[in-house]
Amino acid sequence: MSKTAPKTYITSGHSGCAGCCDAFAAKFTLMGAGPNTIVINPTGCLEVMSTPFPYSSWQVPWIHSLFENAGAVASGVEAALKALGKKDDVKVVSIGGDGSTMDIGLGALSGAFERGHDFTYVCMDNEAYMNTGVQRSSGTPFDASTTTTPAGKVSFGNPRPKKNMPAIMAAHGSPYVATTSIGFPRDMIRKVKKATEIVGPTYIHAQAPCPTGWGFDTSKTLEIAKLAVETCLWPMYEMENGEITQVRKVKNPRPVEEYLRAQKRFKHLFTMEGGEEEIKKIQAIADWNIKHFELQ
Amino acid sequence: MIDPAYRKKMVVVEGSYAVAHSAKVCRPNVISAYPITPQTHIVEHLSQFMADGEIPNCEYVNVEAEFSAISALIGASAVGARTYSATTSQGLLLMHEALFNTSGMRLPVVMTVANRAVSAPINIWNDHQDAIAQRDTGWMQLYVEDVQEACDTLPQLYKIAEDNEIMVPGMVCMDGFILSHVYEPVVLLEQDLTDNFLPPFQPEDILDPEDPKTFGAFASPDTYEEFRYLHEQAMQKALPKIEATAKEFEEVYGRYHGGLIDGYMLDDAEIVVMAMGSILGTVKDVVDKYRAKGEKIGVLKVRSFRPFPKEQICKAVKNAHAVVVLDKNISIGTNEGALFTETKSCLYNSKVRVPVIGYTIGHGGRDIPVESIAKVIEETKKVAKSGITIESQFMDLKEELL
């Protein structure tokens, strides 16, 4: 990569919260994809904050249709570019949150990948439905407190682990699936660039911490993102044709407690009886990642 | 008497084949559809055309559901492609949310709907409930009477939808099975005539990196209402355009099926039977018998249900003694079919004072025999005399099943 950062194609002046992860994710995605890109954005924070009519932060052609159809809209965009003889020059990139990607839009996304459309899907995973007020998604991690899985007298929060979305997308026969994090902009830009240059449906799963939903200071977004990687709760790897081909090593993994303690959504684990046991379970997830992805 | 030269052009083909052929000669760039009875044959024929390389510059997207079929066309249309789909019943209902989105973004997608009843109970046969349930989605809806009209209306609807003053999507509603699966003589649309009639799609705004634009933005209470107003205005502009396009079509192809509405024995009619779709053929047969006896019965075909031709309907029935509306649908909770309700609604705001009665008929493919139409006409004659209108009712209910 050159020392000069690539230009991005999303302007400031949007109405995102201070420290917004989506703004970072969109920015890094476009830095990787470049100006010859059509962006498809399902409903979510990013769409709402970047296009309050008559304003728009997008300096590339951009379309938002619905919450659950970005995969299908991207299919149509790609098919039309092909039919009109424009596909060679233009990249098609969809940027969606975990709700639209992993839950309501999974059917349309699966269809698009199975059909082999040439586009890149970037999931900015902030681990809950932030646009509607921090409700659980299938990307919400184990024991996180959300407004629909709140911690309470008999609950430690979300009772299930995250859905393994990268594995699902790789299982579609995607030529390229990668995880990344907005805490590592160079990594994200490189992976998006690589994904958009590969022909076929490619998928990037980006960790995107949300200060509002997770409960941390707005200046700490990138710091928290880095901490997730350093505690091995967010392994960063690339998969080509279903095989893991590259892993970002974590030499000295930090205890998950550091990551959990920094966020209000896990606060109950430090105050409730039995919280220590729960933290051990989360440490076990990180330990499994270390072993499975050979992070060390 | 059919001109022998014209007769020579006629072929007997399945309705679905004829419609698929029509879609083909309209030169779509992206077709996206999911098979569902009784639309299936349309998309199968199109798939075969694709497999035989007969549709140039076109991509066929074999989606995993109707919701994605319409969503793919949203993306494709926004890039500047002419787009086509066909669906029916549950498939059309599955598209519901995206139908609003298509029209709200003012994307002129065109679709054939092979009308079918909706679940539950599941039923695959014809009525109009599926399309009527989409009446507020902001799509144009043109209902056709026979296969020839189903074919001929496609290029007309593209021309109307893609007019830069309008830019509203539209559906050609044809009765499932009755028209989609019937073999009848038709003239398949000629490519050269269609190229002459239907210019290439040239939208003013598209998704293009050379000139980036934002589609489907977020609108606050400050701006949202104006989008709705402009959408309604576009529909109003479509009213004269539908009329004009039907006439232009006639000039090029020599066939006319009506514009917004069409009349049969209507000018001096004392009793008017109003309906949409293939039932009109049966109604016309019954009316012929009445006319042979010297009774002044006429038929008002409503071709455009959206936009709704209020003015034309008021004018068409102003001299009638009574009007009866036959609806292959019901808005449950009103005991009325939609055409009946809307007809009464537009008459109320006019100076026309005609008694109007309604029947909801032919649900789930139930046959509508000529005897029943005659019975309806007899009831309407009574209303014409008494001036007393009656509650809308189901036709030919089987009391023993209740």
Curated annotation (Swiss-Prot), chain A:
Its cofactor is [4Fe-4S] cluster. GO terms for molecular function: 4 iron, 4 sulfur cluster binding; metal ion binding; pyruvate synthase activity; thiamine pyrophosphate binding. CDD domains: TPP_PFOR_porB_like. Pfam families: TPP_enzyme_C (PF02775). Residues 140-150 have a biased composition (Polar residues). InterPro entries: PorB-like, THDP-binding, TPP_enzyme_TPP-bd. Signal peptide: none annotated. [4Fe-4S] cluster binds at C17, C20, C45, C210. The keyword Transmembrane helix does not apply. Keywords: 4Fe-4S, Iron, Iron-sulfur, Metal-binding, Oxidoreductase. It catalyses: 2 oxidized [2Fe-2S]-[ferredoxin] + pyruvate + CoA = 2 reduced [2Fe-2S]-[ferredoxin] + acetyl-CoA + CO2 + H(+). Binds 1 [4Fe-4S] cluster per subunit. Its EC number is 1.2.7.1. Residues 140-159 are annotated as: Disordered. It also catalyzes the oxidation of 2-oxobutyrate. PANTHER family: PYRUVATE SYNTHASE SUBUNIT PORB. Heterotetramer of one alpha, one beta, one delta and one gamma chain. This is Pyruvate synthase subunit PorB. The gene is porB.
UniProtKB/Swiss-Prot annotation, chain B:
Its EC number is 1.2.7.1. It is an enzyme of class 1 (oxidoreductase). GO terms for molecular function: pyruvate synthase activity. CDD domains: TPP_PYR_PFOR_IOR-alpha_like (cd07034). The keyword Oxidoreductase applies. Signal peptide: none annotated. It catalyses: 2 oxidized [2Fe-2S]-[ferredoxin] + pyruvate + CoA = 2 reduced [2Fe-2S]-[ferredoxin] + acetyl-CoA + CO2 + H(+). It holds the Pfam family PFOR_II. Keywords: Oxidoreductase. InterPro entries: PFOR_II, Pyruvate:ferred/Flavod_OxRd, Pyruvate_synthase_PorA, Pyrv_Fd/Flavodoxin_OxRdtase_N, THDP-binding, Transketo_C/PFOR_II. Heterotetramer of one alpha, one beta, one delta and one gamma chain. PANTHER family: PYRUVATE-FLAVODOXIN OXIDOREDUCTASE-RELATED. NCBIfam families: PorA_Arch. This is Pyruvate synthase subunit PorA. It comes from Methanosarcina barkeri (strain Fusaro / DSM 804).
